[in-house]
Amino acid sequence: MNIRPEIKTAFIVIILGIAIWILLTFPFRYGLDIRGGIRVTLQCQKTEGVEITDDAVRRTIEVIRNRIDQLGVTEPSIYKEGSDKIVVELPGIKDPERALEIIGQTALLEFKDETGKTILTGSALKNAKVEFDQVGQPMVRVEMNPEGAKIFADFTSKNVGKQVFIVLDGKVISNPVIKEPITEGTGVITGRFTIDEAQKLAILLRAGALPVPVKVIENRTIDPTLGKDTMESAYRAGVIGAILVVLFMILVFRFLGLVADIALLIYVVLDLAALKLLNATLTLPGVAGIILSIGMAVDANCLIFARMKEEYAQRKTPMASLDAGFRNALRAIIDSNVTTILAALILFYFGTGPIRGFAVTLSLGVALSMFTQITITRTLLENLLSLPVFKKATKLLGL
């Protein structure tokens, strides 16, 4: 089925317009190595009665994610590494010590009677927030779910005049005396907290206790200026590389090379727009994947043009050389790109963090480069060869 060149050109213009709109509308997500922040590796600890299972690690990740969300950190990255490790990456964070305390604390809250028997745990809480008493001292008001409220009302009704011990991770943080039955399902936790301590406790209680204890085995702080300097160096190198590629393509392939440069620019716009649309996090390995896919796109154009020259040497017309050149080069291009995508999929499956970012940008870039070569590059070349000036001026064309 032959599609008219005008329709193909209109399709390219529409796709390019949408891509430019995406680039101008949506922001990039930058990874830790570019934006700076902290990277913490946690190891789940096996204790008596607690097994380290995939489900336990998954639930631990969810609790940590809830805590981080309440810290107000944008675009955190939390993922499992191995069978018992959790990696937490927090870009752009301003108070890493406080974040580390909130991330790694088990936060098992217990309400105990004077004999040490546990009456309630933090799982009975529905909400926790910071309030202030009459003298401005911060405290944490907790609200219980219906089941917890019923149990606590029954306990306080039977133990008026006795103490209730509020214990966090085995440490008593408050031991008030029960003056009257508490039937509303709310209570306050006092303990000479600072405002930061009260806010931290409220966050921990709202997010819930970690299903398994964790231990910090690695903690790295990444300076944002390092990522900025690296990106500036990569940008300069990219500009210089792009200029050299453009000059090389024009010098070797002349007008064919110029068309390839235009198609390459369109490809870069489509690739960056696709990354933004997928909400992908851009890291330095991801940038490397983009650059590598651009290199593969240039290689494919060189292969197509070399085939076109071979066909033209057999006294074919420029348009017939174009058809035969694409047809003969397509198999090699597809084989090369599919092999690269398979390698990227293996990296994505077995890798973590930055390795996955490299795999995503590489596979996406390679897939888009195939689309660009088959549709955009060919359409641009067909439009070029249809011009009367190039029907005889084949030297200028590059054939």
From Swiss-Prot:
An annotated Gene Ontology molecular function: protein-transporting ATPase activity
Record key words, sorted: Cell inner membrane, Cell membrane, Membrane, Protein transport, Translocation, Transmembrane, Transmembrane helix, Transport
Keyword Iron: no
UniProt signal peptide: none
Topology term for the membrane: Multi-pass membrane protein
GO cellular component, one term: plasma membrane
Location of this chain's protein in the cell: Cell inner membrane
Gene Ontology biological process: intracellular protein transmembrane transport; protein targeting; protein transport; protein transport by the Sec complex
Membrane-traversing stretches: 7-27, 239-259, 262-282, 286-306, 329-351, 357-381
InterPro entries documented for this protein: SecD, SecD/SecF_arch_bac, SecD/SecF_CS, SecD_1st, SecD_SecF_C, SecD_SecF_C_bact, SecDF_P1_head
Major localization listed first in the record, in broad terms: membrane
Positions in coiled-coil regions: none
Keyword Transmembrane found: yes
NCBIfam families listed in its UniProt record: 2A0604s01, secD
Function: Part of the Sec protein translocase complex. Interacts with the SecYEG preprotein conducting channel. SecDF uses the proton motive force (PMF) to complete protein translocation after the ATP-dependent function of SecA.
Family statement: Belongs to the SecD/SecF family. SecD subfamily.
Self-association state and partner proteins as the record states: Forms a complex with SecF. Part of the essential Sec protein translocation apparatus which comprises SecA, SecYEG and auxiliary proteins SecDF. Other proteins may also be involved.
UniProt protein name: Protein translocase subunit SecD
Gene name of this polypeptide: secD
